[in-house]
Amino acid sequence: MQVTLSVDPLLLAGAVLALTAVFVSALVTRRSRRFRVPGALLFLALGMLFGDDGLNLISLDDAELVQNVGVIALLFILLEGGLTTKPTDLKLAALPGLLLATIGVMITAGITAAGVWLFLDVDLLTAGLIGAVVGSTDAAAVFSMMRTTPLPRRTAALLRVESGSNDPIAVMLTVGLLATYDQGATAGQWVSFAAIQLIGGGIVGGAVGMLAVVTLRRTALALEGLYPITIAAFGALAYGLAVTIGASGFVAVYLTGVLVGALLPRQRRSILGFHEALANAAEIGLFLLLGLLVFPSQLPAVALPALLVTAVLTLVARPAAVWSCTLGQGYRWRERTVLSIGGLKGAVPIVLATFPLTAGTTGANLIFDVVFFVVLVSVLIQGIALLPTVKGLGFEQHQPAWAPVAEALPLEGIEIDIVELHVTADMTVAGRRLSELAIPDGSIVTAVVRNDEVIVPKGDTEIRVDDVLLITTQRDRTALQRLTAWARGEG
């Protein structure tokens, strides 16, 4: 007697595919790093190998399923991108990052669409959709490359801020074009749509992010493992509320992550570790599914058009966006060259390419195949070219790998928190010696982090603006509020 559920074969196939991907990835990690090829491409290749056009072990032709899974995966990838966006990155690159994430995506999409329409025999809608879906860079691919690419702080910060925040604009352009195809839209409706998407998403993300921060600051959860799960739930809440009112759920999710990452000092190590793993799992699963969905035998037919699109995208559209959005901000031609090459593509364009498939748009299969090919080629070329370009321009600048985080010590019976305090100009502790400061009872400054260097504090150590104080304090619900009030001279 045997009982088998319909989901059992799917679980078995999924487990075999995922484990194969992980172990093969581990075996080729050194070579992939040597040749600067993002590991995500391996998961795409494995999906293609196991799919209908390969070994035919797993059959997947449900674009709507892949799209829905892709949206969920992007939710967690963007949430993790927001959580890991450092306040120092925002300070260094907020303006150019915001410009590249908005106007830059539009410039990239517009120029690419114009090139597609001029060089390929397609209609304006198809050209516009191809431009829109390849308009953004991929956070996972960019972060992967930057881990082993020695870039100056400002350049690295700009790439991080841009890649973590530009997906919502590409989504908005794609959805807007499809809505225009289905319903027709005037220029005024486009402006209204964009405003609701961006402003509404920003408001929802800001509100949910602050709600998460206030709630978790005032609530001591029973288990440390509940903190990252709660943050994930707040991210899903932000997305759901935003799309319910017609705003951008992706803008809301990213902003929620930014606020939580910047303002919630408690349990940051466990929160970031959990969400990094969750985002990696989402990325692996997403690339495997996308590889299963594509038919490799159809790619040679679109090779020439896709190469033309890639050329326009990497040689014209991306540089034009970078140079336009960094004018008057002190960026030299070497930095702009590196920024142009560093705009790697990844899963987001392929997920967006499933939108025309599910909408039944004319030329949807062509769009998907072209975009898939463009992502493969652009990641290979840019991934391989980035480090030699950085070295050739004499632009190498190694950054310290250590980054401070606040952490509640997870040792049984030890009620201690290590609190991270960023010193700003409005704080009364700025410009004063440590011996002059009456720190609250039960707390002690154990380290000062300045320009990524750790200073062991003494009585004559001067506290400066932009320092990060690591303070050991007895764990209680009011410790963070008392330390903040102390730093601002309010108590």
Each language-model region and where it sits:
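Transmembrane helical cores of multi-pass secondary ion antiporters/exchangers
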Residues: M1-A403, L411-G413, R464
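Structured loop/turn residues at secondary-structure junctions
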Residues: V37, L344, D426, Q474-R475
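Hydrophobic side chains in well-ordered alpha-helices
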Residues: V142-M145, T389, R433, A479-L483
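A general boundary/transition motif marking the beginning of the first structured unit of a protein
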Residues: V377, H422, I471-T472
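Short linear loop/turn motifs
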Residues: P400-L409, V445-N451
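Short glycine-/aliphatic-rich beta-strand segments at the starts of folded cytosolic domains
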Residues: I414-V423
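Cytosolic Rossmann-like ligand/nucleotide-binding regulatory domains
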Residues: T428-T478, R482
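Short peripheral tails and domain-boundary helices/loops at the edges of structured domains
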Residues: R488-G491
